[in-house]
Amino acid sequence: MAVLLTGKPVADALSADTRTRAEALLSKGVQPRLVLLRCGDNEADGAYIRGAVKRAALCGVAAELRTLPADASADVVAAAIDAVNRDPAVHGCLLLRPLPPHLRGEESALCARLTPDKDVDGMTPESAAAVFTGQGRGFAPCTAEACMTLLRHYGIDSCGRHAVVIGRSPVVGRPVSMLLLRENATVTVCHTKTPDTAALTRKADIIITAAGAVNSLTAAHVRPGQIVLDVSMNWNGTGLCGDADFPAVSSIVEAITPVPGGVGSVTSAVLMAHTVRAAEYLTGEGGA
């Protein structure tokens, strides 16, 4: 049976450091503040928001939920983002995505509207450029950075190792590939047009799967000695699960993250760390 790379100790360690930094800001009269902005009221967002608000309290971050109508126009969402940009008391903003179907065509433009210094989830072009180049102030998307934080916490060095990333989304696959390259890993990215993903994953030292497909990572994809980070949160009809056929894969590989309780539980802690670092920079009261 594989070693379980659980997220709680990782999130707790990061949260303790974040709270120390938040308390230093509070002693100077600065309350780190995060706005969670969403359109509509769906349960999937609700579960994430509840976890984020709980983590914010542990980290000394004030989290405020601003909910727009599900049928809000692009102009209404833009105005809400502009309000965040203008408010000096707000240091970070997370726009819950995906947006409702009628706004999907406007999503990129709305994300780009946020002031980059308040972009704590890597959704602006400036943040993407910083992740790609390794230069600038932009934050990586929280889930991608959570993968790297988890690897570091468990002493898993990606330098010189072959990492296979399954998925190429701008939220996980692409940015985590860039972060792995920054750590001198050799990275292969698989996607829906990859002809034989299993042939590539079997050669990997580290597998990060973010396909969003139940049981898409099977025993045929893995070998002994590998590290598997399962990023996806899928519904299999009875509960949450990742991409991996967990019983089969965990009986073969060296270590694996559970779902739930793995990478996802670290993501909200990264979000709070980003918010405090943004507050340090925006107020000039810390070394972000």
Q: Model-derived features: where do they sit?
A:
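Glycine-rich phosphate/diphosphate-binding loop of Rossmann-like nucleotide-binding domains
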Residues: 39-53, 137-227, 231, 239-247
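N-terminal glycine-rich anion-binding loops that anchor highly charged ligand groups
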Residues: 24-34, 40-58
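Short, well-structured alpha-helical segments in soluble
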Residues: 76-88
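Positively charged, low-complexity intrinsically disordered leader regions
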Residues: 1-30
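Short beta-strand elements in bilobed, periplasmic/extracellular small-molecule ligand-binding domains
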Residues: 56-70, 187-189
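Anion-binding alpha/beta catalytic cores of soluble intermediary-metabolism enzymes, centered on
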Residues: 92-158, 215
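Rossmann-fold NAD(P)-binding glycine/threonine-rich loop
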Residues: 108-129, 230-283
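Short beta-strand segments
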Residues: 38, 94-98, 166
